Amino acid sequence: MSVELKPASKYERKIFYKEEWNVKDVPDFIRNSLTSREFGFDHYGNGPNDRYKVFVDDLRLKRFIKVKQPFAAYCSVAFYDKPNQRKGWQKSELVFDVDAKDIPIRTCDCAEGEVCEKCLNQAKEIVLMIRDVLSGDFGLTNINLIYSGRGYHVRVLDEDVMDASSELRGDIIQYVTGSKLPDLSNEYGFNDLQPFIIPFGYPKNFTRWSKYTILHLRRSSKLDDVNNQLLRDVLKHRNLLQEDLWGMFRSNIGPIRYKKVMNAISRINMQITDTKVSIDLKRILRLPSTLHSKVSMKSTLIKNIETFDPFDDAVPKFVYERND
């Protein structure tokens, strides 16, 4: 049966937290650090106004959620000495937030603010690329992937990055998402050296992301400083990138126009993740295992991203029991 992504009623929330939710489904990386994290709750659908909560053990967290049956539950990516005051910051997870409704190059026909199976699959593709860069280029290993209900969170707990400043996190985002046009003339002494020629490091990553973005452009896509004719030419010749024929693609577009396109692509790439989330050391994120009440989906720790399907693995039982 198809799954309709509509809000959960108060009764459905009650059923979910009474019959289905289990505190043991909260990931270990959160349960093992409960006393260092701030928790926040949205009880009425107006945002997480109930903040500064701390739980000393699983039992107290379980009791609170079972009784309150919140519209949404969150916990901090930060670790504190005094989480109930958000004081004594120790470190923060490095996080990437990919929301399917905010992908700038969506290939679906969803209305603004809505999501569907197609754009959720696209969000999953993006998360896989982010994970590969984090593990391949940065050598990070403690990478946790979470389905948030309308997208994905990538939560990194390697100690090497958890004490990074907001500024450094911004630089990491630029690298990971290929959102800065490489300036190769200064580094290598050539004025016309193109990133697609260099098969390693950031130039390789930038080329990979640029290819992904260009192949997902549509006629309706809006690119800064790219007019309709140039966009049509990009769409006409982008099949060359399937075979990584960047030189021919650049030649067909023209060097000056090509540079305009690549500058625009880098700015689009910056919008693939929510940068504000990544650089905010005190951000709270949806608590995995809890309900995303706006779409009636479970936020879920993903064990195998390649086989994960939110419409099989993150749908609460009450959704299948609906009569309307």
Curated annotation (Swiss-Prot):
GO CC terms of this entry: DNA-directed RNA polymerase complex; primosome complex
BP-aspect Gene Ontology terms: DNA replication, synthesis of primer
Pfam families: DNA_primase_S
Keywords: DNA replication, DNA-directed RNA polymerase, Magnesium, Manganese, Metal-binding, Nucleotidyltransferase, Primosome, Transcription, Transferase
Active site: D97, D99, D274
GO molecular function: DNA-directed RNA polymerase activity; metal ion binding
InterPro entries for this protein: DNA_primase_S, DNA_primase_ssu_euk/arc, DNA_primase_ssu_PriS
Cofactor needs: Mg(2+); Mn(2+)
Record keyword Magnesium present: yes
The protein's Enzyme Commission number: 2.7.7.-
Signal peptide: none
Enzyme's top EC category: transferase
Subunit structure: Heterodimer of a small subunit (PriS) and a large subunit (PriL).
NCBIfam families recorded: primase_sml
Family per similarity comment: Belongs to the eukaryotic-type primase small subunit family.
Its biological purpose: Catalytic subunit of DNA primase, an RNA polymerase that catalyzes the synthesis of short RNA molecules used as primers for DNA polymerase during DNA replication. The small subunit contains the primase catalytic core and has DNA synthesis activity on its own. Binding to the large subunit stabilizes and modulates the activity, increasing the rate of DNA synthesis while decreasing the length of the DNA fragments, and conferring RNA synthesis capability. The DNA polymerase activity may enable DNA primase to also catalyze primer extension after primer synthesis. May also play a role in DNA repair.
Identification of the protein by name: DNA primase small subunit PriS
